[in-house]
Swiss-Prot record:
<protein>
    <recommendedName>
        <fullName>Small ribosomal subunit protein uS2</fullName>
    </recommendedName>
</protein>
<dbReference type="GO" id="GO:0006412">
    <property type="term" value="P:translation"/>
</dbReference>
<comment type="similarity">
    <text>Belongs to the universal ribosomal protein uS2 family.</text>
</comment>
<dbReference type="InterPro" id="IPR001865">
    <property type="entry name" value="Ribosomal_uS2"/>
</dbReference>
<dbReference type="InterPro" id="IPR023591">
    <property type="entry name" value="Ribosomal_uS2_flav_dom_sf"/>
</dbReference>
<dbReference type="InterPro" id="IPR005706">
    <property type="entry name" value="Ribosomal_uS2_bac/mit/plastid"/>
</dbReference>
<dbReference type="GO" id="GO:0022627">
    <property type="term" value="C:cytosolic small ribosomal subunit"/>
</dbReference>
<dbReference type="InterPro" id="IPR018130">
    <property type="entry name" value="Ribosomal_uS2_CS"/>
</dbReference>
<dbReference type="GO" id="GO:0003735">
    <property type="term" value="F:structural constituent of ribosome"/>
</dbReference>
<keyword id="KW-0689">Ribosomal protein</keyword>
<keyword id="KW-0687">Ribonucleoprotein</keyword>
<dbReference type="Pfam" id="PF00318">
    <property type="entry name" value="Ribosomal_S2"/>
</dbReference>
Length: 258
């Protein structure tokens, strides 16, 4: 059984790539055609590669791997936080701080500062301080929570990165590459696939597309952690006899652009 159906991908708009003039030629093998100046992603390949990504994440999670979900653009921010949390994993969904991986010891000191401020806010310490100082400390706490809240409980460097848009998250991907941390990524037609270990050709600019793929990655983590008998009931889809052929999808796309 496939993890995802062609119909699901189509309905979420996963097939829409970028304008042809913005493409990266290395993505050519994942492009089915071009319609009205827009590249159309080959969803048959996406179905297979989602399966590969799912299996990779599931197997890593079975071995206890920690997965860091990364997606800082507005289309990805909510889904990244919600799905990582659902899977009991970690996330960065606002801004990637340079050195998050390669300078982890420094990041750990900032995380400890965040935890100290959270404790001070909860144990009554703030009530004993001047109001002006409390205002400044709260601002510091809120800023640290925004950028580091999703990784404050991460025990160490992640074992795998799941990234939405490696072009946008270039620094995160470079750091992972330097440390030999595998990168699984949703990658659109404008990005270089060579920097990614496990590729999912997909529209990484549509909220529905991002949420669909990210939810499958979260399902993979959950299955890996809990065992196959406890896999999410909707993690797999039965073979759909009515699934459109790639030619029919092309026709649907063409009609939608008219």
């Amino acid at each position: 059984m496939a993890v995802i159906s062609m119909k699901e991908l189509l309905e979420a708009g996963v097939h829409f790539g970028h304008q042809t003039r913005r493409w990266d030629p290395k993505m050519d093998e994942y492009i089915f055609t071009e319609r009205n100046g827009i590249h159309i992603i080959d969803l048959q390949k996406t179905v297979k590669l989602v399966d590969e990504a799912y299996n990779f994440i599931r197997n890593a999670s079975t071995d206890g791997a920690n997965v860091l979900f990364v997606g800082t653009k507005k289309q990805a921010s909510d889904a990244i936080a919600e799905e990582a949390t659902r899977a009991g994993q970690y996330y960065i969904n606002h801004r990637w701080l340079g050195g998050t991986l390669t300078n982890w010891n420094t990041i750990k000191t900032r995380i400890q500062r965040l935890k100290d401020l959270q404790t001070m806010a909860e144990d009554g310490t703030f009530e004993q301080l001047p109001k002006k100082e409390v205002v400044l400390l709260n601002k510091q706490r809120e800023k640290l929570e925004k950028f580091l809240g999703g990784i404050q409980d991460m025990p160490g460097l992640p074992d795998v990165l799941f990234v939405v848009d490696p072009k946008k998250e270039e620094i995160a991907v470079k750091e992972a590459n330097m440390l030999n941390i595998p990168v699984v990524a949703m990658i659109d037609t404008n990005a270089n696939p060579d920097v990614v270990d496990v590729k999912i050709p997909a529209n990484d600019d549509a909220i529905r597309a991002v949420r669909l793929i990210t939810s499958k990655i979260a399902d993979a983590v959950i299955e890996g952690r809990q065992g196959q008998d406890s896999a999410p009931e909707d993690a797999f889809v039965e073979g759909d006899e009515n699934t459109e052929s790639i030619e029919e999808i092309a026709n649907i796309v063409e009609e939608g652009n008219n």
